Each structure stands twice: as C-alpha cells, then as structure tokens.
A protein has these predicted regions:
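Active-site histidine-anchored catalytic micro-motif
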Residues: 7-114
Length: 114
C-alpha cells in the first residue's frame, strides 16, 4: 500500500504533535465544555438500541456535527460500548486536500475537550 505522510508527528522542537480541537464550541460541531460534551455523548449512546450480542469486528460511524449525526453515531458506538479492543484503527477522509494515496499520521495525538 502506498502512503503519503503529512509530516505531523513532531514540530521543530521535536515535541510530539498534538492536534487541537478545530471545530469545538457553541458554533462548532460539538461542545467545547467537557461536562456538556460527555452528557451529549452518553445521551446518544444510551438512547440507541443494541443490535446484537456478538462483538463487532468493525464500525462505520458518521463524523458530522452532533446536531446532524449524533443519534446515528450513538447507535454505532452503542454496538461496541460493552466490549474492549486491543487495537483501534480510525480511517477518515481528507476534507481539505485531495489525496491520491493514503495519509498516515506517524506520531502524535488528538486533543479533545474531554
């Protein structure tokens, strides 16, 4: 598989790259206040029906603003909330650059309001 690295593993000071929340807040896609965000997430998951008893191998979930996709994302995550996983791989599209290959973040972390 060919990949394209976006070189976001570290900065000039050789400190790990931290991607800060880009769309949190009152006019964003999700709340910036931890207590409000946690309450929203719990309500979406708790309000969803459990589909089956077996452990899902994969999960497809929307990633739009919670006002648009919260109930659907809650249903998806409700299916895995009772299980633990050793490895989780998150795959998402690029919204800003058209990529011919896969982009992989070699190191770093995503910061959330939580």
């Amino acid at each position: 598989m060919e990949t394209t690295s976006m070189h976001c593993g570290s900065n000039e000071d050789n400190k790990p790259y931290i991607r800060h929340p880009a769309v949190a807040g009152p006019y964003g896609f999700y709340p910036s206040k931890p207590d409000v965000l946690l309450n929203d997430i719990r309500s979406y998951i708790d309000g969803a029906e459990k589909y089956g008893e077996s452990k899902p191998f994969g999960l497809v979930s929307p990633h739009a603003g919670y006002v648009y996709s919260g109930p659907v994302a809650g249903w998806a995550y409700r299916q895995i909330v009772d299980f633990s996983y050793k490895t989780v791989i998150v795959i998402s599209p690029s919204h800003f650059v058209r990529l011919q290959k896969v982009s992989v973040m070699p190191a770093g972390a995503y910061q959330t309001p939580l």
